[in-house]
Amino acid sequence: MTDYKNTLNLPETGFPMRGDLAKREPDMLKNWYDKNLYQKVREASKGKKTFILHDGPPYANGTLHLGHAVNKILKDIIMKSKTALGFDTPYVPGWDCHGLPIELKVEGLVGKPNEKISAAEFRQACRDYAKEQVEGQKADFIRMGVLGDWDNPYLTMNFETEAEIIRTLGKVIQNGHLYKGSKPVHWCLDCASSLAEAEVEYEDKVSPSIYVRFAAVSAAEVEEKFNALGKGQGALSAVIWTTTPWTLPSNRAIAVNAELEYQLVQLGNERVILATELVQTVQNALGIEQIQILGSAKGGDLELIRFNHPFYDFSVPMILGDHVTVDGGTGLVHTAPDHGQDDFVVSKKYGLEMAGLVANDGKFISSTPFFAGKGVFEANDLVLEKLKETGALLKLERIKHSYPHCWRHKTPIIFRATPQWFIGMETQDLRIKALSEIKSVRWIPSWGEARIDKMVANRPDWCISRQRTWGVPMTMFVHNETEELHPRTLELLEDIAKRVEKAGIQAWWDLDPAELLGEEAKTYHKVPDTLDVWFDSGSTYASVVEQRPEFNGKSTDMYLEGSDQHRGWFMSSLMLSTATNNKAPYKQVLTHGFTVDEKGRKMSKSLGNVIVPSEVWNKNGADILRLWVASTDYTGEIAVSHKILNSAGDTYRRIRNTARFLLANLNGFDPKNDLVNPEEMISLDRWAVSCALEAQNEIKEAYDNYQFHTVVQRLMRFCSIEMGSFYLDIIKDRQYTTKADSLARRSCQTALWHISEALVRWIAPILSFTADEIWGYLPKLDNRAEFVFTEEFYDGLFGLDESDKLDDTYWQQLLKVRAEVNRVLEQARNDKLIGAGLEAKVTVYASEEIRPLLEQLGNELRFVLITSQVVVKPLSKADVAESELTGLAVKVERADGEKCPRCWHFATDIGSNKEHSHICGRCIENVEGNGEQRQFA
């Protein structure tokens, strides 16, 4: 028997079936950077509308975790998809390089500044350490396939950037937003420095929970206010509740709410003042069975009544404050202006001075009675003993509650009033302006707007000064006596900025004030503080975006970070940009959630659920990591596990297999010579291209709306359903068995070529390495760009002509018919009636609505159903039972005739040609004749 294998057009491609990404990706990366891919993308986009995504700088310390990978990959997907959508997308990655975490690391390496080494040497060690960390993180970001100007990133420690940060401080001063004051700030005892809101984490802590008596100076005065003269018996006290006994030495008042009702209550053998709504709660907490209400009064009537401090020899007033609620406690609030924001504000209204009892190290100063030299948390028990001694302790318990901790040391922090520099939220209407600007920004997801709006509405003034060594200095001079800024501050700041531009921040520390101030140097001194690192990163809209030539003076389109940055970078950037430019620094803000395991738990070493990004790309490849990120709805928590990554691998294989099938069947196709005009193409091929156009429109829209999981879902629908289980299955017979240069085959290859050109661009933003690999295997074109990343989405797709009878509705109906036929064929296979579908003869009983659709294809219906023979008959009650598709019934029999060894179809004409006695007439026509003619499929 003749071997007809060499008469078939078998698929062939060098594109491997296995991705082997972990091995291949590094070689591709080398090629990208050897050939300056990023610059090629920039050159190809020259003159197009700019889209600027400003990179929020990660901290230059430690190895990258999955959260970093999610963030950078999302940014990269956006930048690559925006390029494909026709934008110029310069991307300048950056790093945050100053601040405490680096100081602590360097202290561990070289010791504290001014101990083993000088402050100048310490700063240089910090700079060297940060640089080393940047290089390590940079290599990992590049390995993820993230494109950007990695040779010229921005670092907040670059001399030019440090200078611009100082200039931004100058604008803040110029616009009247900076002031110095003693206010309570978050204070870390281990850092010996104030902390920003974003540097505070809340963890559970066990604290004493105490009810404390403040005895009335004049019981008669209180009785009169409550209209209870002579009522009740025993001592009369105001009762407060607190979980911070150590703040009681600093108590200077008791706050009540003017609008709340209070009652004088007989509790056993004493009388106490409580908010009416909390009497029952306190009674239960104290375990007292019977009480008596002696009188009532509004909080406003109790103003300025005095009560004795529980263990010091002075009295404190009762004052009014809106912050007092009945959410807990007693409705009377212990007020220590040094140690609480509300306490400070309300005390200021009454002219109450701060106590100033706690030093920088968290210990009570030497003049503090009873507690001198004791640490605040150590003093808790001592205060309790003192309260017991004076009879002021009404009740003591221990409770577990949420308490602020230092993000770095994981230790409890305190509120402490210290002299600091602040950006005032009310000065020059900064809060009002910022709230207005929030409304002009597109927040993705939309709930981000309400979140940051609430934070801005309620945030205190921003303490921007820090008592650190490694940071941008607050390069100001203040008067020795008045503490006022030098009148030429703005001019001096610019002079210092120019020096910093040349020599870095050390120029300030080395500066002799006399160089700039002359004789005035005797009456002015340098401010010793550094700027909050959130000021560094928050001012990058000015120090980076406004300075880099590739941004061309354009404002930023998007900030994209984790949802914790509403109170971090988004907030600091909004505050500074509004303070200096009267506008938000961004047009859109996109946030993503945090990574958790498949059970929704945080990643932690103790749970053993930590997945390191490098593990993923070393085992699976970076494209799998990228596909996992794109497949997830990033607006909520982002689940990851080895099982989930394996699932991403399955999705990847489906896409890769589709691409491989396309490439293999483009074997021998030259677009310059073999392309078929749309109107000459076979109907099914035209439909396949129109499917690709519809998919592309949806994919472009999803990319434009940053809905990458929708992109992946649409890709899978296209690859698996529209192509894999329908079109690509049907065309195999035509591809392999018709004449190599026939219209039937070239029409199909034309469709596959258009689809390949589109598909490779669809996946490029997500599966960057795989897209680059596919690009190299596509049929050669004289004008083909070297890299897919310089290209826009494919513009060669076309829809069905309006005059085309076999429109999308028609083919969608055929899809349903084919699915039903496949179901019945599967049943016949299970019943051992047939093996492969080509062993079947199918009779389709169709309703009057469906039958004309099937008959339109004539003899080509069998190619769509992938059976050897098909008969279409009218549906009647006498026929076999209707199928799951209304208006259709299917009957399966074994096909007539013999199996053709060339096309595998069963035919009754095998042996009718003596020269080719083993193959069917159709194959003889394709081997010897002019080739079979196809019109529809």
From Swiss-Prot:
ATP binds at residue 605. A motif ('HIGH' region) lies at residues 58-68. L-isoleucyl-5'-AMP binds at residue 561. It catalyses: tRNA(Ile) + L-isoleucine + ATP = L-isoleucyl-tRNA(Ile) + AMP + diphosphate. Keywords: Aminoacyl-tRNA synthetase, ATP-binding, Cytoplasm, Ligase, Metal-binding, Nucleotide-binding, Protein biosynthesis, Zinc. Its main location: cytoplasm. Its cofactor is Zn(2+). Its EC number is 6.1.1.5. The keyword Transmembrane helix does not apply. InterPro entries: aa-tRNA-synth_I_CS, aa-tRNA-synth_Ia, Anticodon_Ile_BEm, Ile-tRNA-ligase, Ile-tRNA-ligase_type1, Ile-tRNA_ligase, M/V/L/I-tRNA-synth_anticd-bd, Rossmann-like_a/b/a_fold. HAMAP family: Ile_tRNA_synth_type1 (MF_02002). PANTHER family: ISOLEUCINE--TRNA LIGASE, MITOCHONDRIAL, SOLEUCYL-TRNA SYNTHETASE. This is Isoleucine--tRNA ligase. The lineage of its organism: Bacteria, Pseudomonadati, Pseudomonadota, Gammaproteobacteria, Pasteurellales. The gene is ileS.
